[in-house]
Amino acid sequence: MKIISRVLLAGLLAGIVSSASAQGTAGAARWPTRSVRVIVTFPPGGSTDAVMRIVAQYLGERIGQAVVVDNRPGAAGAIGVNLVAHAPADGYTLLLGPGGAIAINPSLFEHLDYDPVRDLVPVSAVARAPFVVMVANDAAAPASFAELIARARARPGELSYGSGGSGSAMHLTGEQFRHSIGAQIVHVPFKGSVLAWTTMVNGQLSMVWVDTTTMNGALKSGKVRVLAVTSRERSSLVPGVPTVAEAGIPDFEMIGWFGLFAPAGTPADLVARISTDVRHVLALPEVRERVFATGNEAWGSTPEALGAFVRSELAHWARVVRETGARPD
């Protein structure tokens, strides 16, 4: 009787697994039957929002349903991430997760209501861009990144840098720069990168670390110069500008990025279906061109590749926080 019971139990379990698998496959085949919502953790009008709206337009055309951008800013991205983490795992609520909320917050904040690895499933990378260091476009500012380093080392505590906010990726990039060259540089956080660079050109800061979208707007003013870019190799987003590594700080690489995530528990075949559609959109020449115009590089990936990247970013930013002692104000 025990043998028969085991056989019956094994058959029952196999049937359950087979049924669940079939339901998942059928769900992926039917998706979507209604509009899809993508949570963006920034307010309307910024580059992250702009990129998602570009992708949403073309993705909606491909899947035959509207893709609606829902802006949920606040709490360093935690509001939007939490919303998706607790949403039904059915493919109808997705997250455009920025590197800060996904990879930096876990190291900066002791008590987060979410775990990006536990609560989210990677779908596809969407876009990326390096950061840059800018100085005022005047004779008093350093002529090169090497000269900036020399000044910082020669004048402990006299130089200052601005960022778009305490705990931001640009803040941590500035701290890693300070740590790497062994200099004392004062951090001045602002509520937004535009205020940081306009303060700098008025003579109240030595430098600013900003993203390439902010850089593009600042360069149009003619009042700033870009000294270096934080990508491992020179970037087409910042043509002709040397990397930080070229100036003598080896292995210095910091990039901003955002990717598409689904709630944990979303069926793997549905995740694969969404990822395929998103990557198709990001490969379109007109989409790549429009994303580039926002100051970002379109960047699609498989779910597995994004998952591996997120794990590497979590380790990277944890090391930066540990080495620099940076904390949000």
Language-model segments: residues:
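Hinge/capping helix and adjacent helix->loop/strand transition within the periplasmic-binding protein
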Residues: H86-Y92, S107-L195, V244, W257-R290
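An extracytoplasmic/periplasmic, membrane-proximal ligand-sensing/linker region
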Residues: T33-S35, H179-S180, K220, T243, ...
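Bacterial N-terminal signal peptides
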Residues: V7-S19
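Positively charged n-region of N-terminal signal peptides that target proteins for export
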Residues: M1-R6
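C-terminal lobe and pocket-closing loops
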Residues: R128, M215-A283, S312-A315
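N-terminal (or domain-start) structured segment
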Residues: A22-R118, E158, G182-M207, G300, ...
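A ligand-binding cleft/hinge motif common to bilobed small-molecule-binding domains
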Residues: A101-H111, H171, Q176-S180, M207-V241
